[in-house]
Amino acid sequence: MRLVPTSTPAAQPPLILRLSVTDQVLCELRRRILHGVIEGGEPIPESQCAETLGVSRVPVREALLMLEREGLLQRDRRGRTVARTLGGRDYEEILTLRLEVEGMAARLCADARTEQDLEALESNIAAFAAAKSAEELASLDAEFHGILCSASGHRWLLTAWSTIRWPFEALLVKNFRSYIQATSLEESKVSTEDHRRIVEAIRSRKPHESELLVRQHISRWTDWKPA
């Protein structure tokens, strides 16, 4: 497992830090998995991880269990904790699930949304348009769809979304990297206009149009399946 510092610029720390040691370990390991620093199939030894991060094994053990529940880790045949390898089948299954879950979310959101929800979506779109890397784009894209699901007001729908949220972002990082390599950073932001149209339909309280736009948006990614 590679736990050496990476060249990815660190995010600016918030004004008030209240994360527990477990949460800090969770965020750091999740970031490394999402960004591909820890690759699929790579073991994550609890003791080595604790030593490298300068913490005890207890918060590491708790963080690894959380990451396993999030779908980013799994147990291999030898019982080791390894980063989950996400491939074409995972992509297809997550995509088809997103079509149903997020389509429904958009439809419900058009009726249930608040002004705060609209502000959160608009703020996300602005940040997405200003993003400077595949990792930022993936994080903000996943965040946009998470806001939709949360704003739907449907608790079980949000639970369903949470089961795919992090694997979805991990796959998005790969997709945006491929898209940027094939085109450019700016061209990779084609989702910006899709997101704006979705928000306008939701703002206008048009449930069926909102659902249709989300489904069309998700379907655009069909051809960008990872190997």
Indicate where each model-derived feature is located.
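Short linear motifs at protein or domain termini
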Residues: M1-D111, P226-A227
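C-terminal all-alpha effector/ligand-binding and dimerization domain
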Residues: R2-S7, L17, V173-A227
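Short helix-adjacent coil turns
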Residues: G36, Q116, F128, K132-E135, ...
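A ubiquitous short alpha-helical element
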Residues: L86-Y91, A106-D111, A129-K132, S178-E186
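Hydrophobic packing residues in well-ordered alpha-helices of helical domains and bundles
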Residues: I94, L118-L121, L137, D141, ...
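Hydrophobic, amphipathic alpha-helical faces that serve as interaction scaffolds
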Residues: L97-A110, E143-A182
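Amphipathic coiled-coil alpha-helices
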Residues: V101, N124, A131, L140-I147, ...
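Amphipathic alpha-helical dimerization/coiled-coil segments
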Residues: M104-A127
